[in-house]
Regions:
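Canonical tetratricopeptide repeat
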Residues: 30, 64, 97-101, 139, ...
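Alpha-helical segment of the N-proximal tetratricopeptide repeat
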Residues: 23-50, 54, 327-380, 401, ...
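Beta-strand-rich ligand-recognition modules
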Residues: 259-306
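Accessory carbohydrate-binding/adhesion or oligomerization-edge regions at the termini
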Residues: 101-214, 295-361, 366, 371-373
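Short coil turns that delineate tetratricopeptide repeat
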Residues: 22, 56, 90-91, 131, ...
Length: 547
């Protein structure tokens, strides 16, 4: 007969050391963050490592050490630790969203670093909202396009299910963003044949666009040459029945969304953001529904949007179809719109409420805000974190991005000085000081900082490009040529370095043959518009020269 008392005691005996290890590990994580704030640079890394050794499943330890490596621009270990974190974290999706555009996920060779499998896992196992899956489709489209595998690229872009059949109209006046509140004729009845008075008297009428960007974004700059303007996109959505649907939009520019002539979403700030940034649940009527997008820009340089119509999980609705052709629809039937907050922002806001002393949540919430250009929200979040830990360099480096997006240049300079005072060996802080010295042509002091970068982050394409820039600033032609040739041998797939090497070849040989070969070699692995256009321009310049 099984002795339940003995079994219970055995389980208790085995569990006590495990609980002790977890408690000890958590204590070391807290000590690591405290040391980070105090400036005990030599203690932070060992404490995180000891915490992981004590409990390899401690997600705070894995995440904290990943952030430490990323701050020091050691992206391979940063990404490796973050992948381990994802495997241990019960709800990894908010963390993936927050980290998506950070340097450790933006490394050039995403297959080697293991980012590629994360995308494929999202393709096969969508996140609850479907937003990360759509982002993975976009990344895979980009990945294959850069390699010239256009059929694969097109396939993954199409899986995003972005609406592609639109008519567009513009430009309309938007001086000092005044067009956001103005009601322009396209906001009324849709009339494809009508011509309206547009910006500066330019006739504005609806046009059916014959081609869009391969990634599914409707880019007004590709159809119009006018800045400081408001533009419209119009399409019709057919639903086999009345049903709730999510209208998901990402933009560069201010935004208003109308469904069946009813305003269901508006955002005044001109932000550069990602797909699904704005999500509103509304009623699609049975039959055809008019969807109108109003975008404006006056402070930024881009104006575009992507729209998706999905269910609550970000998946395609059955029986839905789209057409830019004029359709009969019921105007203002009552959409009952309800804006859905960003899931990752909500998650980290709740984590901060529950654990106000865990600084990583402030950093990740700021990442969520800043990746969608919410500069003020990101700044306020990081200010609170700095109030709690005024000596932590991670917080200062992140708030610089908030200041940059908010164009607060004085705050950037002050914060960078503070960051350099806290840790003069941070690559980010060194580069800021180095660039200031280069602007004032203090080359000797600048070279000292460049040498420090060589010691801290050796063997990177960024450092090689900085060395070329250093000799260019000094107008040291032999060194420019020498450093460029060295850099190109090591980093032929870096566009800045490859283009510089080609330019030097043209200048020194007065011929284009080698430059063409450099561009062609680059394009073998990096099929980009920039490289293609440069190669085409080189062919034109060399048209009278025997290549």
């Amino acid at each position: 007969m099984l002795n339940f008392r003995a079994l219970f005691l055995l389980i208790l005996f085995l569990a006590v050391p495990l609980l002790a290890d977890r408690s000890q590990s958590e204590q070391m994580v807290n000590r690591a963050w405290e040391a980070w704030d105090r400036g005990d640079k030599g203690e932070v890394l060992p404490l995180f490592e000891k915490a992981i050794a004590a409990d390899s499943t401690n997600t705070r330890a894995l995440l904290g050490l990943s952030l430490w490596y990323e701050l020091h621009e050691q992206y391979k270990p940063a990404w490796g630790l973050f992948r381990r974190f994802l495997h241990q974290e019960k709800n990894p999706y908010p963390y993936l969203f927050a980290t998506w555009t950070t340097p450790k996920m933006a490394v050039p060779d995403k297959k080697e670093m293991g980012v590629f499998p994360v995308w494929m896992d999202l393709v096969d196992h969508p996140d609850p909202t479907g937003t990360l899956q759509a982002m993975a489709f976009q990344e895979l489209g980009d990945f294959y396009q850069r390699r010239g595998m256009l059929d694969s690229s097109r396939y993954y872009y199409e899986q995003t299910r972005a609406l592609e059949d639109w008519t567009v109209c513009g430009p309309f006046d938007n001086i000092s963003a005044s067009g956001f509140e103005r009601i322009f004729p396209p906001e009324g009845k849709y009339d494809f044949q009508k011509t309206y008075p547009g910006q500066s008297g330019v006739p504005a009428k609806w046009h059916k666009i014959s081609a869009i960007r391969s990634d599914g974004w409707i880019d007004f700059r590709r159809y119009y040459a006018y800045d400081n303007a408001v533009y419209f996109g119009n399409t019709f959505v057919y639903s086999p029945r009345k049903q709730r649907a999510e209208i998901r939009v990402g933009t560069s520019g201010s935004l208003k969304v109308f469904l069946n002539d009813e305003l269901i979403l508006e955002y005044f700030d001109e932000n550069n953001n990602d797909l699904d940034t704005y999500v509103v649940t509304a009623d699609l009527q049975k039959g055809w529904n008019r969807l109108l997008i109003k975008c404006g820009y006056s402070e930024i340089t881009q104006c575009n949007f992507m729209a998706r119509v999905t269910d609550g999980q970000g998946q395609a609705l059955e029986g839905i179809r789209y057409s830019s052709e004029p359709q009969k629809y019921s105007a203002k039937p009552g959409a009952e719109p309800r804006v859905r907050p960003n899931f990752a922002e909500q998650y980290f806001e709740e984590q901060i409420r529950l654990f106000p002393d865990q600084l990583e949540n402030y950093v990740l919430l700021a990442h969520c805000y800043l990746r969608n250009d919410k500069a003020i929200e990101g700044e306020l979040t990081l200010r609170e974190a700095i109030r709690r830990a005024p000596g932590n360099p991670l917080l200062y480096q992140n708030i610089v991005e908030a200041y940059s997006r908010g164009e607060k240049f004085d705050e950037i300079a002050t914060t960078m000085e503070r960051l350099y005072d806290i840790d003069e060996n941070l690559p980010f802080a060194i580069r800021f000081q180095y660039n200031r010295l280069m602007e004032s042509e203090q080359f000797d002091r600048g070279e000292e900082l460049l040498n420090r970068l060589r010691e801290i982050v050796p063997g990177t394409a960024e450092l090689a490009a900085e060395e070329i820039g250093f000799y260019s600033a000094k107008r040291d032609v032999p060194k420019i040529i020498e450093s460029t040739e060295t850099a190109y041998r090591e980093f032929p797939d870096n566009w800045q370095i490859a283009a510089t090497r080609a330019m030097i070849s043209i200048q020194t040989t007065r011929a284009y043959g080698e430059a063409v070969e450099i561009y062609q070699k680059y394009l073998e692995k990096n099929y980009t518009i920039n490289a293609l256009s440069t190669l085409a321009e080189t062919y034109l310049k060399a048209s009278a020269v025997d290549l």
